[in-house]
Amino acid sequence: MKTKALVVIDIQNDITKHYRDIIGNINAAIEWALAERLRLEKDGNACGSMHIVYIKHNNTTAGTRTFKPGSKGEELVPEMKVVSDNIFVKAKSNALTSEAFSAFITANDINEFYVAGADATACVKSTCFNMRKAGFMVHVLSDCVTSYDLKKLPEMLAYYESKGCEVKTLAEYQ
């Protein structure tokens, strides 16, 4: 059975302002994932399932100014559609370091991921690399990722492909 998940990484109040350029695409990806889940459920779940997951970064370093646990900055941005309670917290760049998220993956037999979020040069990069290293199929939604440094996006998309990720726009999956 193919179980999939849309993973939205670090779209929080303290993230780069560039998230505003892609929030419409991220919300469209969430709607697509919901429709995909309904389609799979209609098929009697014989083909698998689609989960929608949100990853939040918490910066636990002393003296930090951003992503502080319990602060407004660590909250998911208000413009984003939140359609599930699958919200996991990480303290490192790689989302797989979240024990709760890793347990969720195992419990739901998830083996394929569609990735959106920020930052393309940090947390998205580390998560995609480590997902591929763990043997998962990874699809990066190229129009649903952003960075503090937009000039690095083309380089990052090429990096994801070089590590075995499929890189396409959301429209190419719809």
What are these regions (language model features)?
Residues 124-134:
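Short Gly/Thr/Asp-enriched flexible loops that form oxyanion-binding sites at enzyme active sites
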Residues 77-121:
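Internal catalytic-core helix/loop-beta-alpha segment
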Residues 5, 51-53, 112-114, 137-139:
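A structural signal for isolated positions on well-ordered beta-strands in alpha/beta enzyme cores
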Residues 114-117, 136-150:
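A short glycine-rich beta-strand->turn/loop micro-motif centered on a GG-aromatic cluster
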Residues 110, 135-136, 165:
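Short phosphate-binding/catalytic loops that engage adenosine nucleotides
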